[in-house]
């Protein structure tokens, strides 16, 4: 396997392990999720460059749009929780409660 792909998969795995380790804090979870999205973006960009197919050129852009939307929603939740409770614990995020 090419070392570049191995490094990107290692970055994704480390971000996934960080997400599993720091799942109680929203800020750490969002940072790990961004690391996962960036490694997926780089991987899809490299695949699109290597295949040279016009159909795969749009995939990294779509992934980047979804990553930006995810970051905006995550930061909005973080600001809302920190203003309400003063902490960024995920267990404070109980939106189903009336």
From Swiss-Prot:
Subcellular location(s) per record? Mitochondrion inner membrane
Q: What is its main location?
A: mitochondrion
Electron transport: is it a keyword of this entry?
Answer: yes
Q: Name one GO molecular function term.
A: NADH dehydrogenase (ubiquinone) activity
| Membrane topology designation | Multi-pass membrane protein
InterPro entries hit by this protein: NADH_UbQ_OxRdtase_chain4L/K (IPR001133), NUOK/Mnh_C1-like (IPR039428)
Gene3D superfamilies linked to this entry = 1.10.287.3510
Looking up Pfam families in the UniProt record yields: Oxidored_q2
The protein's UniProt keywords, in alphabetical order, are: Electron transport, Membrane, Mitochondrion, Mitochondrion inner membrane, NAD, Respiratory chain, Translocase, Transmembrane, Transmembrane helix, Transport, Ubiquinone
List the record's Gene Ontology CC terms alphabetically: mitochondrial inner membrane; respiratory chain complex I
Enzyme Commission numbers on file: 7.1.1.2
Please list the GO biological process terms of this entry. Answer: ATP synthesis coupled electron transport
Residues spanning the membrane: 1-21, 29-49, 61-81
Q: Which reaction does it catalyse?
A: a ubiquinone + NADH + 5 H(+)(in) = a ubiquinol + NAD(+) + 4 H(+)(out)
* Task performed by this protein: Core subunit of the mitochondrial membrane respiratory chain NADH dehydrogenase (Complex I) which catalyzes electron transfer from NADH through the respiratory chain, using ubiquinone as an electron acceptor. Part of the enzyme membrane arm which is embedded in the lipid bilayer and involved in proton translocation.
According to its UniProt record, which protein family does this protein belong to?
Answer: Belongs to the complex I subunit 4L family.
| Complex and partners | Core subunit of respiratory chain NADH dehydrogenase (Complex I) which is composed of 45 different subunits.
Official protein name in the record: NADH-ubiquinone oxidoreductase chain 4L
Q: Which gene encodes it?
A: MT-ND4L
